A protein has these predicted regions:
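Acidic, gly/proline-rich low-complexity N-terminal segments at the extreme N terminus
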Residues: 25-39
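Compact, glycine-rich, soluble single-domain proteins
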Residues: 35-126, 130
């Protein structure tokens, strides 16, 4: 066999190298996808927002897109949601949990939550004085403990209304 025939046979036997194509990483989301759920309703259901400020037990937190994944216990306080259109909404939550998941997903679960504008500063002051009377009164230990918890929530609400 001459060398030309050998070269042809060898070339046919060799598999061509795969064509390499450039791959691109997925685009990182620039919005935060928020779900704010209560037992009886979803106030936000997978809606894109710019930022959410929460009252975590570890301190006040501002959460943006690409936040590190975490789980935070919420204390009673104001949750502020900055929406894409530039407006913001404020809700008072009695407590709960916030979970930041990979992919800029934030889930907030709370037992009670209401828009801040639903509250009257005068009514809150009246309820605080009633709870203080019970907490410092001669009632049972359980009544005093419940009044102290109520005071904590009402004082947080009063601070949010200012």
């Amino acid at each position: 066999m001459n060398s030309l025939k050998v070269a042809r046979v060898v070339l046919r036997a060799v598999r061509p190298a795969p064509a390499l194509r450039r791959g691109y990483a997925d685009v990182a989301p620039d919005k935060l996808r928020l779900t704010l759920a209560l037992p009886h309703q979803a106030m936000y259901k997978s809606q894109d927002v710019v930022q959410v400020n929460i009252p975590a037990e570890s301190g006040e937190m501002g959460i943006l897109a690409q936040h590190v994944p975490s789980i935070e216990q919420l204390k009673p306080g104001l949750v502020e949601i900055i929406e894409e259109a530039g407006g913001n909404k404020q809700f008072f939550l009695s407590g709960g949990f916030a979970t930041v998941q990979p992919g800029s997903v934030l889930s907030i679960n709370a037992v009670e939550g209401y828009p801040l504008e639903d509250f009257s500063a005068e009514n809150v002051r009246n309820q605080i004085s009633e709870a203080q009377k019970i907490a410092s009164g001669s009632g049972s230990e359980q009544d005093k403990a419940e009044a102290n918890i109520e005071l904590e929530v009402l004082e947080s609400l009063q601070a949010a209304l200012k």
